[in-house]
């Protein structure tokens, strides 16, 4: 007797359709008008290791280190309120204007130099590279004064949203932990803000939460979070607003090899070594196996600089090809090749002989920037498809353009009182429309306002002349040669020359 059985093969249905992300080149029309904008000389001076506070709530001297991120929030003028070269360039009823970043140069002042970082009480037990003898067990306090030069990093990252960083932080444990247990680690993402510490060679992690001894790393990152740009996340971002492009150069080598003092939370398993004989110079008590190096960025040279050079954006890595939504640009910079820490000495008491106590020593670090941009004027036609796409991407863009999208019909009945000032009803004065909040107001950036620094005379600026040269364009001459006219004379012809005669 034959029996029918259904097929055991699984049936795979096609995935549901999703909205496709398109490039800005599909709906942004570029014009032939370019503008130059540059900041003034941007300076920052402070202490390279920590913030100086006179009172708990008042900062006297900020922390300014060559190992910090500098994040500039560049404000641009609204092109829809901009004085345009042609009145018929666009139709304000059906079109809107936007800026596109096509050129950039980050200028750095100050000489090249290497700044030292360190800790007067660093957890440094033994020299594990050239140990002359097998070290005995650690004492109660083996901390020493150690300084080092850190990893060398140069970074320039541009987008219309802040860059995203990653670091390892303390995660939530599944069960209760005892004192001294290793906390679970969690990869965390956060916005890179101005003043955040970059990776200096000790990893991207939250040192204040994961190193409670305050003796494991140098002073400048001890109570901080070292962040590393999450290039994978920003590259995979759907619209490509966080990163148009980036320039990066990193190098590091190991200078010294040490180990750390302390009780090993996870001792070396006994099956990984053979025990020493009795009395073998203390080798039955294993030394600390928590090894770590001191980093070094090696030589600093002008041949390997990514700054003070122009860069042109032809095609961005994401779908946003340089369009500055919200009329702003976020520029993230790291440059450890100019991290010189200046020593300042002030006299306390003047004597004929030298005494170190007669002087006070101070540390300062100074940074100098000059930012130049080339922007292209673009226009967008407000069709139904384009407006729907932009509303899905970021509805705040349409709000800034004063373009409203009709909301769906509401099924609720709203109340409207006749006498608003009447005391017989609840107070209507407290019912106010919510103000529009800046989505980045909770973060710290270096504000740079270029609203009044746009110029169409590209040949009057260094970056503008470079742009004209690489684009094969020539500026129109400002001066025209004027032909000199002959002066009018009363005589119609010049007098004839006298002939020479022979005698």
Swiss-Prot record:
GO terms for molecular function: structural molecule activity. Residues 479-503 are annotated as: Disordered. Keywords: Capsid protein, Disulfide bond, Host nucleus, Host-virus interaction, Late protein, T=7 icosahedral capsid protein, Viral attachment to host cell, Viral penetration into host cytoplasm, Virion, Virus endocytosis by host, Virus entry into host cell. Gene3D superfamilies: Major capsid L1 (late) superfamily, Papillomavirus (2.60.175.20). Pfam families: Late_protein_L1. It is found in: Virion; Host nucleus. One of its GO terms (cellular component) is T=7 icosahedral viral capsid. It comes from the Viruses. One of its GO terms (biological process) is virion attachment to host cell. Belongs to the papillomaviridae L1 protein family. Self-assembles into homopentamers. The capsid has an icosahedral symmetry and consists of 72 capsomers, with each capsomer being a pentamer of L1. Interacts with the minor capsid protein L2; this interaction is necessary for viral genome encapsidation. Interacts with protein E2; this interaction enhances E2-dependent replication and transcription activation. Forms an icosahedral capsid with a T=7 symmetry and a 50 nm diameter. The capsid is composed of 72 pentamers linked to each other by disulfide bonds and associated with L2 proteins. Binds to heparan sulfate proteoglycans on cell surface of basal layer keratinocytes to provide initial virion attachment. This binding mediates a conformational change in the virus capsid that facilitates efficient infection. The virion enters the host cell via endocytosis. During virus trafficking, L1 protein dissociates from the viral DNA and the genomic DNA is released to the host nucleus. This is Major capsid protein L1. The gene is L1.
């Amino acid at each position: 007797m034959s029996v029918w059985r259904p097929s055991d093969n699984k049936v795979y249905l096609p995935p549901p359709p999703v909205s496709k992300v398109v490039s800005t080149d599909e709906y942004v029309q570029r014009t032939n008008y370019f503008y130059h904008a540059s900041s003034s000389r941007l300076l920052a001076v402070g202490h390279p290791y920590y913030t100086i506070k006179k009172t708990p709530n008042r900062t006297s001297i900020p922390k300014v280190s060559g190992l910090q991120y500098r994040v500039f929030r560049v404000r641009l003028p609204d092109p829809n309120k901009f004085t345009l070269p042609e009145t018929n360039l666009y139709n304000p009823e059906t079109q809107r204007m936007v800026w596109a970043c096509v050129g950039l140069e980050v200028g750095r002042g100050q000489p090249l130099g290497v700044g030292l970082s360190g800790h007067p009480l660093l957890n440094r037990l033994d020299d594990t590279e050239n140990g002359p003898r097998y070290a005995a067990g650690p004492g109660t306090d083996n901390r020493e004064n150690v300084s080092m030069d850190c990893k060398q990093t140069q970074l320039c990252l541009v987008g219309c949203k802040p860059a995203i960083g990653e670091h390892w932080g303390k995660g939530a444990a599944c069960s209760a932990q005892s004192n001294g247990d290793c906390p679970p680690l969690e990869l965390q993402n956060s916005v890179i803000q101005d003043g955040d510490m970059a990776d200096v060679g000790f990893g991207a992690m939250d040192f204040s939460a994961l190193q409670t001894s305050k003796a494991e790393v140098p002073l400048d990152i001890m109570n901080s979070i070292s962040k590393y740009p999450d290039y994978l996340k920003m590259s995979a971002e759907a619209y490509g607003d966080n990163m148009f492009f980036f320039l990066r150069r990193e190098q590091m080598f190991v200078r010294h090899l040490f180990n750390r003092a302390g009780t090993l939370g996870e001792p070396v398993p006994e099956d990984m070594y053979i025990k020493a004989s009795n009395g073998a110079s203390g080798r039955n008590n294993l030394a600390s196996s928590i090894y770590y190096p001191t980093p070094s960025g090696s030589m600093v040279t002008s041949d390997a600089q990514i700054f003070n050079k122009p860069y042109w954006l032809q095609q961005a890595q994401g779908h946003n090809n340089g369009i500055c939504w919200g009329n702003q640009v976020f520029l993230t910079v790291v440059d450890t090749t100019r991290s010189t820490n200046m020593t300042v000495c002030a006299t306390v008491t003047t004597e004929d002989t030298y005494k170190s106590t007669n002087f006070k020593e101070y540390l300062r670090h100074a940074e100098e920037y000059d930012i130049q941009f080339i922007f292209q004027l673009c226009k967008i036609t407000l069709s139904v498809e384009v407006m729907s796409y932009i509303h899905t991407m970021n509805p705040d863009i349409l709000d800034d353009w004063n373009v409203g999208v009709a909301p769906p019909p509401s099924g609720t009945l709203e109340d409207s009182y006749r006498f608003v000032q009447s005391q017989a009803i609840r107070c209507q004065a407290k019912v106010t429309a919510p103000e529009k909040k800046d989505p980045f107001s909770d973060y710290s950036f270096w504000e740079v306002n270029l609203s009044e620094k746009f110029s169409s005379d590209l040949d009057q600026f260094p970056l503008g002349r470079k742009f004209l040269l690489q684009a094969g364009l020539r500026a129109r001459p400002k001066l025209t040669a004027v032909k000199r006219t002959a002066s009018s004379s009363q005589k119609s012809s010049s007098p004839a020359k006298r002939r020479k005669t022979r005698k």
